Every structure is written in C-alpha cells, then in structure tokens.
C-alpha cells in the first residue's frame, strides 16, 4: 500500500506539471518570485543536535533538503514551500531543492520559507519552481548559497492563475497519500517489535481476507486515477 501511494503521488505530480505546461502554452507571463510570495525566513530558529535530543516530540524539524528530526514544538502551521538556502541548493539539472510541507513543523535556518502572497497558490509556485533552472542566482564556490535578494529577483514563467485551480484537488490527494504512508510507517514501527517477539500471533491472521481488502482498495484507486490518463506525462 505504501509503495502504491508513493507511485500514485509520482503520477499526480507528473499530471500537475503537464497541465501547468499546457496552461503556459495558452497564456503566460514572466513574474518576479518576490512579487508573488512572502519569505518567512525571520521566523526560523535553528536547534543544534543537543537541543533536539532534549526536545524530542511529534513535530517535523526540516533542514535544507529533508526532515532532520522531530521536536516537541512547532514554528509554522499550514502549507509552505521550502527552498534550500545553502549547501545542497540545486540538483544536477540546476533546479532548486524544494520541499512541499504542511501541518505543524519547525524549520531551521538552512531553508528559505515561502508563503503565498498573491493570486497564485503555493502549489502553482512549487510546480513553477520545479521546472525553472536557478544556477544563475547561486553564489559561493565552496559553500553554495541562495540569498534572499537573489531569490526575490528570480523570474518565473506563470500561466493565468485561474487556469491552475485544478492543482488544489491534485495536491489534496497528494497530501492524503503522504499522511496515509506516515500512518503505515507508524503502524509498522509499533507492530514489528511485537511480531518479532511473538507477542502477536501471525498464525491467527486471515491472509485471504487481508488480500481481499487490499485488492478492493487498489480497484478503488484505479477508478479514481486511471493509469492510462497518467502514463506518458513528463515531470
């Protein structure tokens, strides 16, 4: 199930990108990133490893590229786009290292925090950034860095905002799948020690019934998101 959700999310992002490209073909304009987002970098608070060890909790602690830890409090609540500020800031194709995040979480000082500040949703901005090479705004030979000034001046090709309303449904499904995966991981971590110790007797599990439930779930998802409509799209 986790593997299916991950695969489905890949298709969803491909679909979102393809439809974004189609909207650009019909209508597009160049905008400065600083005109359509608000940077919330001033709200960031870094915690060193000792601080984090003393503050273990349920809230994700994000760095430049991924979740680094979990802590007992949060600084942000809601959807944001994180863009690596220093270190690993671009991929092999010169595009930015991005994280699409939601819920309650903490962010350190190695990621720029983008909040929506225009008619364009963060989902639209996330897709636009994913397809935009940004090597020209990266400075530093030893330690790569993207300054706030350079980031605000970054130019993006954007279609008409109203043509991107479909992104809300796609990303709602994306978030739902991610949350389900997190729940599956938590369930695995809780059950595995009991299975290994013999506390849970697997001989009493009805495998046929379990397979039936999984097959039914797969059929429902297949009807919602037919793979024939997703294959062949370009990320």
Tell me what each language-model feature is.
Residues 1-47, 51-63, 157-204, 218-235:
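Non-catalytic DNA-recognition/assembly elements of restriction-modification systems
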Residues 1-3, 111-119, 134-136, 148-173:
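Proline-centric
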Residues 17-22, 70, 110-113:
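Charged, low-complexity surface segments at secondary-structure and domain boundaries
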Residues 28-29, 50-52, 67, 72-76, ...:
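Short capping/connector residues at structural and topological boundaries
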Residues 34-93, 97-100, 211-214:
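DNA target-recognition patches
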Residues 40, 129-132, 170-171, 209:
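Alpha-helix boundary/capping residues
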Residues 63-65, 74-130, 135-151:
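A short beta-sheet element
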